[in-house]
Amino acid sequence: MATETLVELAAYLKEKLGDKLEESALAFGELTIVSRLDAIIDVLMFIRDDSRCQFINIIDISGVDYPARDKRFDVSYQLLSPFQNLRLRVKVRTDEDVPVPSVCSVYPGAEWYERETYDMYGILFSGHPDLRRILTDYGFEGHPLRKDFPVTGFVECRYDNEAKRVIYEPVVLRQEMRNFDFLSPWEGADYVLPCDKKAKGNGDK
């Protein structure tokens, strides 16, 4: 029943929003629609206010990085309609330079979600009232959830006893990076326990 409802919702949104939507997909019991970047405000306002939709709650905003694509980033909006008991995912695609319109005017709760997405991926949001980092430290370099961000990071912070403060310095690996792709010496051994010998002895009788 839920799948039929989502199929009907997808058709309804396509009818009402037309070319503002680039595509839609239904998979694993979830509906995802992809909006044109310049139409995201109109799309979200419609699905928030339309009586058949009423997606009034924004649960999360997140980014996804696909480095091989020209538009390498997806911005994903997770929405909830308590009235219809439905969830909906809305996506837009962008690159490192083109900002995504902030949706804070549509969903005030999106402010910190957009800050987190900016902090982790470097995705810009135009019209955001306070677009600054929210999770990483002051002076942090780069955006840690990008696929091209090094595992070790660029700098490390530590407390310096001489300076009596926290300092930042280039990462120094205490040992060479190693590839641990080998069979563990604790795997595959054929250990025979005393109880096994006893059971085998009873079976032989």
UniProtKB/Swiss-Prot annotation:
Family: Belongs to the complex I 30 kDa subunit family.
EC nos: 7.1.1.-
Cellular component, GO, one term: plasma membrane
Membrane topology: Peripheral membrane protein
Taxonomic source organism: Bartonella bacilliformis (strain ATCC 35685 / KC583 / Herrer 020/F12,63)
Protein name in UniProt: NADH-quinone oxidoreductase subunit C
Organism phylogeny: Bacteria, Pseudomonadati, Pseudomonadota, Alphaproteobacteria, Hyphomicrobiales
Catalyzed reaction equations: a quinone + NADH + 5 H(+)(in) = a quinol + NAD(+) + 4 H(+)(out)
InterPro entries hit by this protein: NADH_DH_suC, NADH_quin_OxRdtase_su_C/D-like, NADH_UbQ_OxRdtase_30kDa_su, NADH_UbQ_OxRdtase_CS
Molecular function per GO: NADH dehydrogenase (ubiquinone) activity; NADH:ubiquinone reductase (non-electrogenic) activity; quinone binding
Complexes and interactors: NDH-1 is composed of 14 different subunits. Subunits NuoB, C, D, E, F, and G constitute the peripheral sector of the complex.
HAMAP family: NDH1_NuoC
Main location class: membrane
Keyword Ribonucleoprotein in record: no
Group of enzyme by EC: translocase
The entry's keywords: Cell inner membrane, Cell membrane, Membrane, NAD, Quinone, Translocase, Transport, Ubiquinone
This protein's record includes keyword Translocase: yes
Pfam families from the UniProt entry: Complex1_30kDa
Subcellular location(s) of the protein: Cell inner membrane
Function: NDH-1 shuttles electrons from NADH, via FMN and iron-sulfur (Fe-S) centers, to quinones in the respiratory chain. The immediate electron acceptor for the enzyme in this species is believed to be ubiquinone. Couples the redox reaction to proton translocation (for every two electrons transferred, four hydrogen ions are translocated across the cytoplasmic membrane), and thus conserves the redox energy in a proton gradient.
SUPFAM superfamilies: Nqo5-like
Disulphide bridges, residue numbers: none
